[in-house]
Amino acid sequence: MNNGFFNSDFDSIFRRMMKDMQGSNQVGNKKYYINGKEVSPEELAQLTQQGGNHSAEQSAQAFQQAAQRQQGQQGGNGNYLEQIGRNLTQEARDGLLDPVIGRDKEIQETAEVLSRRTKNNPILVGEAGVGKTAIVEGLAQAIVEGNVPAAIKDKEIISVDISSLEAGTQYRGAFEENIQKLIEGVKSSQNAVLFFDEIHQIIGSGATGSDSGSKGLSDILKPALSRGEISIIGATTQDEYRNNILKDAALTRRFNEVLVNEPSAKDTVEILKGIREKFEEHHQVKLPDDVLKACVDLSIQYIPQRLLPDKAIDVLDITAAHLSAQSPAVDKVETEKRISELENDKRKAVSAEEYKKADDIQNEIKSLQDKLENSNGEHTAVATVHDISDTIQRLTGIPVSQMDDNDIERLKNISNRLRSKIIGQDQAVEMVSRAIRRNRAGFDDGNRPIGSFLFVGPTGVGKTELAKQLAIDLFGNKDALIRLDMSEYSDTTAVSKMIGTTAGYVGYDDNSNTLTEKVRRNPYSVILFDEIEKANPQILTLLLQVMDDGNLTDGQGNVINFKNTIIICTSNAGFGNGNDAEEKDIMHEMKKFFRPEFLNRFNGIVEFLHLDKDALQDIVNLLLDDVQVTLDKKGITMDVSQDAKDWLIEEGYDEELGARPLRRIVEQQVRDKITDYYLDHTDVKHVDIDVEDNELVVKGK
């Protein structure tokens, strides 16, 4: 053939090109394209062979026909549905899905919507973790069992991956072509139902966002949805449904909302019982009923920011995985390989007439065989409630444990431990200790903070120190104290420092340093509002909700849980002018500074008393202990005489100012003088502190 394009010269060039490519030593590492189509080395060799017997035009036509046959084999509508999604109904037939417990109502509602003649598109709306995807899996199982209306008894639920639709669509029109193939696949199968998890992603998915006319997935699906040509099940959260789906009125009216609420604690326990067998088989760990109940109860109490049943299932899964890792299963392959090696060694020993060695090898073989037999189908560990407590502790950092004898004694002695650090304030210590014991023992109502207290009294008597010691004793970390100096919250913009700015104001997206964000990150904290009388009245209004309901809504609309915090407000109102407030009614004094509804929210209003000299004796010992801790880093020991202690108390005592002057005296007279002595005697290992001529002196050894 000789025309404008295919002629004898081109035929010769084509054959020469094929010959050069075939002779390359690196064919496997190259890519070959003919007419813009990539071909494999095998296809290239076949075309080369054809080119030897036919013209170049015939070879090109043969390649196009082969490509069309390949596209016909791979591009069928039925196959395309399998390529972009999972057939949940088939997985249900194969027994690959977990059982769905306690969701019969939602499954029934979804089945009823699917049975409609038009607009048969249910959308499951619920918060993250409540089990929306599980409901669709439950529907697939119901279809397999035949417990659905006749209109959908033959349906196949295909879970579609939206990213698979967008993959490889770098050219204009490619995405729309994929959608049309999807729609045609559903039409041709006549029984396919598409499931889009996180369906809000279809809004604008595939659109270019310009005026080029490129349409998104939702725009292409709308006509088919309204005519009932395809049926879709969607799942999304309340926020995403409001912010995305409801904004598109045309799309919204094509869906029927099915509300999915969080299951109760009782229902969650039944859910865990239903999936227990799957977890036991996977982890080879036994999971008794009391462990399942502990997963639900402890996750409700200590993981309030998440929802059931997801958080309870996670706790169960983490616990079982942890126990499985501690008791690893026998490696069957390695053990059998070792037995084979020992059999060879035994034969060699028998051949060499080393019967004692052969007998020892036989004993080792028997031990390994017994180990293999015992490991088959046996649970290697049994979970306990204490294991669940350890998991919660690893997740939250809170020392959660069962109420054993040691924990009971620790709760009983919490007041003694605090009293050893807070001198002269027994009433305040006892009131706080009672609130802690009530909460940790599980007798709290759980709808308010662990405790809320107003500490009132003169300066320097231990109000702030009690909050610090409480954070250390209760949560094991001084960083668990969130301290807010209310002098910084006295202006009218103080609310934004507490809950963050609202929409439309600067800093709306950056609320990292607010109280609500700190509590969200560390829900187990002691919150100290120091000198609360200096706060703006709007701050006190916010605290009313926190102390009454145990939660607070931040500037972005998120509800922050305060039910695992201890709220302490300190104030020296009424004590600042030398008034003898001890002889007055404390509530009468407080009403001069705070509204009655604010005072009425506290669990207790505790009056801190003036410190006398007897109390300072214990305080000076604590301050000197802190000095010794510093000296231990240098390997230096210290002895302080009683005369020196009395001298420090006499010099540092001030009834109106409390213990702070004593702290300054210890720093100036003890720490500074030890520092001066150390700089002159760097090899000192021991110092004695005494009084000579009404002066504190330091002598070393």
UniProtKB/Swiss-Prot annotation:
Biological process according to GO: cellular response to heat
Region: II, residue numbers: 383-575
Biased composition (Low complexity): 58-72
Disordered: region residues: 47-79
SMART domains tied to this protein: AAA, ClpB_D2-small
UniProt GO MF annotations: ATP binding; ATP hydrolysis activity
Polar residues: compositionally biased ranges: 47-57
Keywords assigned: ATP-binding, Chaperone, Nucleotide-binding, Virulence
Residues covered by the UVR domain: 336-371
Induction text: Expression is sigma B-dependent.
I, as annotated region: 81-332
Binding site residues for ATP: 126-133, 457-464
Family in the record: Belongs to the ClpA/ClpB family. ClpL subfamily.
Function: Required for the development of induced thermotolerance and intracellular multiplication within bovine mammary epithelial cells.
Protein name: ATP-dependent Clp protease ATP-binding subunit ClpL
